[in-house]
Amino acid sequence: WDYFMNYMNHWNGSYIENDNNINKHWYKKYYEEKRRGIDITKSMNVGDEVDNFWQILKKNVDFKKDTKVLLTESHLAAYKIAIDNKVDSVISFDSHSDLGYQGLDSFKFEVNCADWLGKLLYEGKIKEANIVYGPYTNEYSDQFKEINEAYNINYLSLEEVKCEEPCKIIHICRSGCWSAPWLDNKFKAFVF
């Protein structure tokens, strides 16, 4: 879901997806900005790309009636979802690569929301990762050169996404530490 956040390019850093970062930091951020005279509920929004995302994707991806759709709060769930569903390839639409941010050393530690995709490659659970950055990301593929050289990773635009097989599963992550709670109704409209 943070693929669509029009404020992502202003944020650097990392947020572990836990209760504190999902809920409390939004209240803190809201009141800090309000004291400065800024209403972040007006400036922090989703981009217009959300309106035609599914139409563009359906041109190149075959969704069947039995395609599973899973909703979670954390990208960490994607790791288990990929393993449980025995997928060979993952297409990730996100403002972050989730490959791990310490090069190959990222995989020496437990799986988390920032390295789940890289960990799947490292452990041989998937053969290919396809990353479709959101239009507001501040990341770029060269930041992951060491990982890119070690594994089969493609960086695509939304229009370049193609699937030869019907899509078995869709995982949609709200990612609450990146997605402002006042956008929840828009999230529901996107999903349903």
PLM features per residue range, with description:
Residues 1-192:
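Conserved alpha-helical scaffold segments that buttress catalytic/binding sites
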